[in-house]
């Protein structure tokens, strides 16, 4: 298990939430993640008038991960605009699985949880036919 400074990640996530574009819900979300090379990447939610096109903060973290050099996510904190811990939605859990695997630690109000515990029996690379991998 990686040594994670959860307070630092929550603080970075709260700062990221300050940049959220949320004119419809007014519900700012920020996320921050520790990368396997020691970097911290952040993201915020960006709403769209066509609600289904809204981008979650966790997806923005994955974009930041790849636009700053790639790597694997080790730990992620997601918070609202006041710094209260939030859990990623199901869609985001699936996206995070691709970039951190089942061992990715997700901040939780009680204790950090493995993504594999939050998304059991997830669809993954092994579910694709071999010729598509």
UniProtKB/Swiss-Prot annotation:
Domain CMP/dCMP-type deaminase: 4-126
GO biological process, one term: uridine biosynthetic process
A Pfam family that the UniProt record links to this protein: dCMP_cyt_deam_1
Gene3D superfamilies from the UniProt entry: Cytidine Deaminase, domain 2
Active site annotation, chain numbering: 58
Catalytic activity: cytidine + H2O + H(+) = uridine + NH4(+); 2'-deoxycytidine + H2O + H(+) = 2'-deoxyuridine + NH4(+)
One Gene Ontology cellular component annotation held by this UniProt entry: plasma membrane
Keywords: Hydrolase, Metal-binding, Zinc
Record keyword Heme present: no
Binding site for Zn(2+): 56, 89, 92
Keyword Metal-binding part of the UniProt annotation: yes
CDD domains in UniProt: cytidine_deaminase
Cofactor note: Binds 1 Zn(2+) ion per subunit.
Binding site for substrate: 45-47
GO molecular function, one term: cytidine deaminase activity
Cofactor: Zn(2+)
EC number(s) recorded for this UniProt protein: 3.5.4.5
Described purpose of this protein according to its UniProt entry: Recycles cytidine and 2-deoxycytidine for uridine and 2-deoxyuridine synthesis, respectively. Catalyzes the hydrolytic deamination of cytidine and 2-deoxycytidine to form, respectively, uridine and 2-deoxyuridine.
Matches recorded under PANTHER family: CYTIDINE DEAMINASE (PTHR11644:SF2)
Subunit annotation: Homotetramer.
Family that this chain belongs to: Belongs to the cytidine and deoxycytidylate deaminase family.
Protein name: Cytidine deaminase
Classification lineage: Bacteria, Bacillati, Actinomycetota, Actinomycetes, Mycobacteriales
Encoding gene per record: cdd
């Amino acid at each position: 298990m990686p040594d994670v400074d959860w307070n630092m990640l929550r603080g970075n996530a709260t700062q990221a939430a300050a940049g959220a574009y949320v004119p419809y819900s007014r519900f700012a979300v920020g996320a921050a993640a520790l990368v396997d090379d020691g970097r911290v990447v952040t993201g915020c939610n960006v709403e769209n008038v066509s609600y289904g096109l809204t981008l979650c903060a966790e997806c923005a973290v994955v974009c930041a991960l790849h636009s700053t050099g790639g790597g694997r996510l080790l730990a992620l904190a997601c918070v609202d605009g006041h710094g209260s811990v939030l859990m990623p939605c199901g869609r985001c859990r699936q996206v995070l699985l691709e970039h951190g695997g089942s061992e990715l630690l997700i901040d939780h109000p009680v204790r950090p949880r493995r993504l594999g515990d939050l998304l059991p029996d997830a669809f993954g690379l092994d579910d694709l036919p071999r010729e598509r991998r």
